[in-house]
């Protein structure tokens, strides 16, 4: 068996085309464009790449992007003041603060300072809580993107056993909630999990997000499983995932590549969340 490749690039292109079409329909009625404020603190090279990708997507689909590039020594109070100003700016529908932040800034405080209806990253406790209660509004972009990729396979997820490798706030925890919402039986593994290989070998769906290259071994994969690799690791100048790709591809029914799998979907779902926040904002005016 050789797995079908789930192209995040192709699915993301469809998602963004649909968003662009909806924005054109609004602007044709003399409505303003959606607005996304993107805040970058410091010059972390990986963060710059991610932020530029988000700004480029905004330009492509008709979202007005507002850039706030702040020096690395920016204080917490200064950043919170900018967020407070954007919270009250009617031309801004979404606020994104690129993580990680410099050590002098408390990321939790920053996340909670963004009003929930502009939290297009889906990190605010209010939005995470909505997902936990089965009434999601703005959803965490990477897990939301993973669900779109799973949807693209045409496989009915209800009743399948999903194993999430990694329990981070950004991927693992909201991912488990998304899979639960889709009717999966969910196991979450983490750094203290015993016999990880056994848990992975039981999975109909494996979602790996630990940030360790080739951490999930191909031999652990159950024949016919769906494998979603969230990891992006640079090794000897190449990008590789958290899953041992070639060995897993030989056993899986579907698999995402790295790059070109989950990465493009994270940006696409950020655009989707921005459109959703914009639509809610328009209705409230």
Curated annotation (Swiss-Prot):
EC number: 1.5.1.5, 3.5.4.9
GO cellular component terms given for this protein: cytosol
Pfam hit, one: THF_DHG_CYH
GO molecular function, one term: methenyltetrahydrofolate cyclohydrolase activity
Residues noted as binding NADP(+) in the record, renumbered to the chain: 166-168, 191, 232
Matching InterPro entries: Aminoacid_DH-like_N_sf, NAD(P)-bd_dom_sf, THF_DH/CycHdrlase, THF_DH/CycHdrlase_cat_dom, THF_DH/CycHdrlase_CS, THF_DH/CycHdrlase_NAD-bd_dom
Family statement drawn from the similarity comment of this UniProt entry: Belongs to the tetrahydrofolate dehydrogenase/cyclohydrolase family.
SUBUNIT field: Homodimer.
Protein name (database record): Bifunctional protein FolD
Native source organism of the sequence: Actinobacillus pleuropneumoniae serotype 3 (strain JL03)
Gene name per UniProt: folD
């Amino acid at each position: 068996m050789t797995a079908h490749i789930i192209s995040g690039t192709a699915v993301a292109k469809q998602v963004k085309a649909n968003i662009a079409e909806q924005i054109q329909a609004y602007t044709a009625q003399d409505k303003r464009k959606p607005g996304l404020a993107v805040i970058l603190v410091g010059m972390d090279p990986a963060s710059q790449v991610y932020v530029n990708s988000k700004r480029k997507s905004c330009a492509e689909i008709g979202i007005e992007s507002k850039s706030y590039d702040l020096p690395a020594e920016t204080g917490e109070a200064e950043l919170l003041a900018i967020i407070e100003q954007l919270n009250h700016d009617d031309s801004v529908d979404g606020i994104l603060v690129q993580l990680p932040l410099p050590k002098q800034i408390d990321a939790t405080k920053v996340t909670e300072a963004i009003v929930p209806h502009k939290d297009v990253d889906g990190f605010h406790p209010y939005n995470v809580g909505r997902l936990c209660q089965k009434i999601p509004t703005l959803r965490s972009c990477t897990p939301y993107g993973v669900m779109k990729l799973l949807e693209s396979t045409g496989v009915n997820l209800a009743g399948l056993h999903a194993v999430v490798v990694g329990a981070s706030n950004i991927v693992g925890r909201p991912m488990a909630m998304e899979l639960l919402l889709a009717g999966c039986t969910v196991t979450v593994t983490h750094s203290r999990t015993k016999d990880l290989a056994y848990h992975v070998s039981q999975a109909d769906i494996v979602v790996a997000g630990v940030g360790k290259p080739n951490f999930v071994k191909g031999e652990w994969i159950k024949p016919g499983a769906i494998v979603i690799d969230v990891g992006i690791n640079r090794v000897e100048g190449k990008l590789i995932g958290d899953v041992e790709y070639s060995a897993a591809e030989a056993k899986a029914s579907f698999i995402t590549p790295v790059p070109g799998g989950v990465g493009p979907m994270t940006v696409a779902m950020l655009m989707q969340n921005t459109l959703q926040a914009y639509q809610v904002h328009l209705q409230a005016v």
